[in-house]
Structure formats: C-alpha cells, structure tokens
A protein has these predicted regions:
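N-terminal, positively charged, Ser/Thr/Ala/Gly-biased leader segments
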Residues: 98-154
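Short, surface-exposed loop/turn motifs that are enriched in glycine and acidic residues
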Residues: 37-38, 50
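Short inter-helical turns and helix N-cap capping residues of alpha-solenoid HEAT/ARM repeat scaffolds
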Residues: 40-41, 71-72, 104-105
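Feature captures the catalytic cores and cofactor-binding loops of soluble hydro-lyases/lyases
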Residues: 155-167
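Alpha-helical scaffold segments in soluble metabolic enzymes
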Residues: 63, 78, 147
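Structural detector for internal amphipathic alpha-helices that build alpha-solenoid repeat scaffolds
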Residues: 2-21, 43-56, 66, 76-88, ...
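Amphipathic alpha-helical scaffolding segments comprising HEAT/armadillo-like alpha-solenoid repeats
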Residues: 1, 17-36, 56-69, 88-99
Length: 167
C-alpha cells in the first residue's frame, strides 16, 4: 500500500543516524530482522546490515558489536565485516572489543587487526579522477564553513581572506 511504502521510505532514508533515540530504535529493529525475530518483506538480513553500515556509528555500533560477538557464525562474520568499515567508535566500544579479544574471540581479533591496518580507509573504493558538479544550489545564509564558505556573514570572520581564496 502507499502508506507502507511511505513508512518504509521514511524508516530507510529519513531516520537520522547517530545517537538519537530514533537511531536507537532503528538499529535495534534492524538487529531483530537480522536475528529473525522480526520480518519485513522489503528488508532482508543483508539489507539490514547495509542499513546499519550507513548509520555510521552511535547505536548502530552497539548493535553491530552484539551481532559480531554473538554465537551465530553466519551473523558474526557479516557483522564483523561491517564493523571494519566503521570509524565512529567510542572508548566503551573499543573496551568491548578488547575484552572479547582477551577472552579469545577470533572475530574481535580480526576487527582489531583491521583497525590497526586502517582498512576502514585503505579499502575505500577509488573515486573517479574527475567529478563534475552540474548544479549546486544554496540559499543566502545557508552556506557555511562546512559547505563552501564563506557565508553571507564572511565580513565578520577573521579568516575571511583564506576562505575567500578557497572559493
């Protein structure tokens, strides 16, 4: 139905990642799908892992660690591969990996070795040599240092000359 489609699109594309309460609900629901505790025809276990990967940290890391350090070997391996792509881990997450490693977990060892080798960076796919930007639209006041900088208030910045030269 249309409502189901809209709901799925919202869940997949519009729930903010990170540490928001909504992200927590999304991550735990995806975990339930992966474990077979919940079923959504449009979200397979593989797609649930992909969605967790795109959440890039926060509560998704906790869920991925639960899955990677669990008992189901098919799930642990897949969760470990996703974890190896993530960079936003907290100290508590690393402590969980350390404890699992010290307890003899081969999965934890593999994840830690991957981080030590910076595979989260070295295994990023190559990008094209030349990327053309066809159109970029930003309303007045919406341009910030995070995007193109300087914004319409650049005259008040002490580094405006530097920012002006970068444009």
């Amino acid at each position: 139905s249309l409502r189901r489609s809209i709901s799925l699109d919202f869940f997949i594309y519009n729930v903010l990642p990170g540490t928001t309460s909504a992200a927590g609900v999304k991550a735990h629901f995806l975990k339930a799908i992966i474990l077979g505790e919940s079923t959504v025809d449009e979200i397979s276990s593989d797609f649930a892992f992909e969605l967790l990967m795109h959440m890039k940290g926060g509560t998704s890391i906790d869920v991925l660690l639960d899955l990677a350090l669990g008992d189901d070997e098919a799930i642990t391996g897949q969760a470990a591969e996703v974890l190896k792509t993530q960079v936003f881990l907290y100290e508590a997450d690393m402590d969980r990996l350390k404890l699992a490693y010290e307890s003899g977990s081969a999965i934890a060892k593999g994840i830690l070795e991957s981080y030590a080798s910076a595979e989260f960076f070295t295994k990023i796919p190559d990008i094209e040599e030349n990327i053309e930007v066809v159109t970029y639209i930003a309303g007045e006041g919406d341009i910030s240092t995070d995007l193109l900088s300087p914004g319409n208030q650049a005259h008040s910045r002490s580094d405006r000359e530097l920012h002006g030269k970068t444009l």
